[in-house]
Every structure is written in structure tokens, then in C-alpha cells.
Amino acid sequence: MTTPQQPHGPLRSFGRLKSRPVKPRQQALLDTLLPEIAVPTGPFQPLDLMPEAKAVWLEIGFGGGEHMASQAGRNPETLVIGAEPFVNGVASAVRHVEEQALKNVRIHEGDARDVVDWLPDACLDRVFIMFPDPWHKARHNKRRLIQPEFVAKLARVMKPGAALRFATDWADYAEWTTERVLADPSFRFADEAADRNAIPADHVTTRYEEKKLGDCAPVFLDFTRG
């Protein structure tokens, strides 16, 4: 099993790395399948992982992997890279990959910010950040993933015209993200008039979303890299 990397920088944007023992079948997949589909540790070219890919997508913090696996299944010609530090989530995702026989998924067990640092300029066609840890207490806001420095890093690795989707069920995190993403001149709303509470046609509901742990209905923010 791949050992989770040390937190990126002085503050990490995620909580516990493990909540419960991994089931034997999932552990077997972590030991055998995960090494085969893991992204390299260090700078890499995405198309080296799947030369025939017509697009490259990144999901940051894929949770249990339901959304990532469904998107990959619907888009078999797209390379879908996912990053997740939570070992139980990675175990679940690897099971989805095996059960659905997905050939276009690559996984990093660790901090997604490392993957963003390793990627070359202008290589991503789409980025998903679905229901990240809200760190909703004011004293913890500095731990939120969406910070100006990270938005700038996303701008570097996304192609002109690439799409960024951020979803949350915490109202203040939606406002926080809107302010910080639009403050970067590289980004704009994909549709200024869009209903942010409308569920996108290509959205895949996850178990986390169904728990309704936030303080508002899900908000979907779709941005375009200029």
C-alpha cells in the first residue's frame, strides 16, 4: 500500500488520513492495482500515462471516488487523474476502478497540491473540486484549499478555455471561493447568469453530498480559464 505523503507545506487542507480499517478485498487492490494506476511521484507529462487521451481532467479530493469513476466511465477517451489523501477514500476508488474496468483513471494517494505542482503548464482541460473540507470555523479558514496562491497554480496548469467546477454546501465557502477565483484575472464565470443551485446535467451525486452536512443547498460554481 502506498504510504500517504507528508502534508504539503505548513498547513494541510484535509483532516484525518484514515477513519476505519480497510476491508481485506480493498487492501488487496491497494497492494496490487493501485501501484499500476498511480501517478508518478514528481514532474510528469499526463499523456505519458495515456497517450491516446483526447483530454485530461483532474479531480481534487475525490472522496470515495464515485464522482471520479462515473465521469471516467462516461468519458472513456479522457484521462481522469484523481488525488485524495484519505486512505479509505482511495481504497473505495480503486474498487470502483476494478469493478467498472476503467482504463482511463490514474490516482495519487496524497495531497492534490503536489500533483498540481508536478503538472506541466497548460495541460488540463477540466478540474473538479467537489465538496472539499469547508474548515468553516473562522480560525480554520486559512486551511481551506482555495487560497489565492493555489488559484494561481491552477491557472498555470489549465489550458485556455479549460473548465473549473467547485461545489460546496457551505454558503460562506461558496462566497469565499467566488471572491478568490474571480480575483485572479485568469478566471471568469462560465455563465454569469447561471443558477448556482441548479444541479449541472453532468453532475454525479455522491454519498457525502447526500448526507447534507453543510448549511445550505449545494452550490455549483463553474469557471472558465481565460
Swiss-Prot record:
SUPFAM superfamilies the record matches: S-adenosyl-L-methionine-dependent methyltransferases
Database matches in Pfam families: Methyltransf_4
Reactions catalysed, as given in the entry: guanosine(46) in tRNA + S-adenosyl-L-methionine = N(7)-methylguanosine(46) in tRNA + S-adenosyl-L-homocysteine
Enzyme Commission no: 2.1.1.33
Region of interest (Interaction with RNA), ranges: 139-144
Residue numbers annotated as active site: 133
Class of the enzyme per the UniProt entry, highest EC level: transferase
CDD domains: AdoMet_MTases
InterPro entries xref list: SAM-dependent_MTases_sf (IPR029063), tRNA_(Gua-N-7)_MeTrfase_Trmb (IPR003358), tRNA_methyltr_TrmB_bact (IPR055361)
Residue sites binding substrate per the record: 137, 169, 206-209
Region (Disordered): 1-22
Pathway: tRNA modification; N(7)-methylguanine-tRNA biosynthesis
Positions annotated to bind S-adenosyl-L-methionine: 59, 84, 111, 133
GO molecular function terms noted in the UniProt entry: tRNA (guanine(46)-N7)-methyltransferase activity
Entry keyword set: Methyltransferase, S-adenosyl-L-methionine, Transferase, tRNA processing
HAMAP family according to UniProt: tRNA_methyltr_TrmB
NCBIfam families: tRNA (guanosine(46)-N7)-methyltransferase TrmB
Function in brief: Catalyzes the formation of N(7)-methylguanine at position 46 (m7G46) in tRNA.
Family in the record: Belongs to the class I-like SAM-binding methyltransferase superfamily. TrmB family.
Name by which UniProt lists this protein: tRNA (guanine-N(7)-)-methyltransferase
Taxonomic source organism: Caulobacter vibrioides (strain NA1000 / CB15N) (Caulobacter crescentus)
Gene assigned in the entry: trmB
